[in-house]
Amino acid sequence: MQVILLDKVVHLGNIGDQVNVKSGFARNFLIPQGKAVMATKANIEYFEARRAELEAKAAEVLAAAQARAAKLAELGSVTIASKAGDEGRLFGSITTRDVADAVTAAGVEVAKSEVRLSTGPIRTLGDHEVKFQLHGEVFATINVIVVAE
């Protein structure tokens, strides 16, 4: 199925590219999320008329993500208190939601879907490096310090 990309899609293409994808991927992911439209003659003409507007919008979103990444770098680290046993193991774990809530409380708005815990949930006390993917190509890293309550 031929589609026109309205946004940059990782491993697929940039704004305005006409790509051939499986119909299920187009119908269930790209089109509902507004990342692509079917490549009909009318849509091609419509897209060419709006190309500059869509590229400006994409640049604006990228600039906003870079500004948030700079704020995260400025923040540096976040402390999360959790109940823990004597050996330094937590009762429960620190998940992406907990990290996102702590960073948001510290003053930088992030969603839990933007948090990347490389080794899964945090289960021990101490310093842990957490990555954030704020945009397709904008990443930030902060240090999460887990302390016992």
Swiss-Prot record:
InterPro entries: Ribosomal_bL9, Ribosomal_bL9/RNase_H1_N, Ribosomal_bL9_bac/chp, Ribosomal_bL9_C, Ribosomal_bL9_C_sf, Ribosomal_bL9_N, Ribosomal_bL9_N_sf. GO terms for molecular function: rRNA binding; structural constituent of ribosome. SUPFAM superfamilies: L9 N-domain-like (SSF55658), Ribosomal protein L9 C-domain (SSF55653). Gene3D superfamilies: Ribosomal protein L9, C-terminal domain (3.10.430.100), Ribosomal protein L9, N-terminal domain (3.40.5.10). GO terms for biological process: translation. Keywords: Ribonucleoprotein, Ribosomal protein, RNA-binding, rRNA-binding. The keyword RNA-binding applies. Pfam families: Ribosomal_L9_C, Ribosomal_L9_N. The keyword Isomerase does not apply. GO terms for cellular component: ribonucleoprotein complex; ribosome. It comes from the Bacteria. Belongs to the bacterial ribosomal protein bL9 family. Binds to the 23S rRNA. This is Large ribosomal subunit protein bL9.
